[in-house]
Curated annotation (Swiss-Prot):
GO terms for biological process: positive regulation of DNA-templated transcription. InterPro entries: Tscrpt_reg_Crl (IPR009986), Tscrpt_reg_Crl_sf (IPR038208). The lineage of its organism: Bacteria, Pseudomonadati, Pseudomonadota, Gammaproteobacteria, Vibrionales. Its main location: cytoplasm. Binds to the sigma-S subunit of RNA polymerase, activating expression of sigma-S-regulated genes. Stimulates RNA polymerase holoenzyme formation and may bind to several other sigma factors, such as sigma-70 and sigma-32. This is Sigma factor-binding protein Crl. Residues 99-119 are annotated as: Essential for activity. GO terms for cellular component: cytoplasm. Belongs to the Crl family. It comes from the Bacteria. The keyword Lipid metabolism does not apply. It is found in: Cytoplasm. Transmembrane segments: none annotated. It comes from Vibrio cholerae serotype O1 (strain ATCC 39315 / El Tor Inaba N16961).
């Protein structure tokens, strides 16, 4: 590990992941486990904002020594504030895939440069472009 790279404690990781953008669900994170999500596309934008559901993705990031495992899921974010795994309609797929792929690139780069940690995608992960 280089002199500039700090030991990846939970709080250093949390601070770094939080700085990456709005996707981290900080209140649902714990030691060695981090939850992210993205509301990429509105299910029905004709509804008033408080009644909207969204298509998107969520990801569970688990720390194992000098490696992180990312498990992505795709689906619908409900009015109740829960994710439901289901197929994304074709009209929303491009936006969901784009946000997921761009976030993953940024995650890999950030963890590699800041902590020399690699990120692997879990075999149970939903595929993305």
């Amino acid at each position: 590990m280089s002199e500039m790279t700090k030991t990846p404690t939970h709080y250093r990781l949390l601070s770094t992941l939080k700085a990456m953008g709005p996707y981290l669900r900080e209140g649902q994170c714990s030691e060695r486990f981090y939850l992210f999500d993205c509301l990429a596309s509105c299910v029905n934008d004709k509804k008033s904002p408080e009644k909207r559901e969204f298509w998107g993705w969520w990801m569970e990031l688990t720390q194992n020594e000098q490696e992180m495992s990312a498990c992505y899921h795709i689906g619908r974010y409900t009015l109740a504030g829960d994710w439901v795994a289901e197929a994304i309609p074709e009209s929303a797929q491009a936006e969901v895939n784009h946000t997921q792929a761009e976030f993953h690139k940024k995650l890999v780069k950030t963890l590699r440069e800041r902590f020399e940690i690699s990120v692997t995608v879990s075999t149970e992960s939903a595929p993305f472009a």
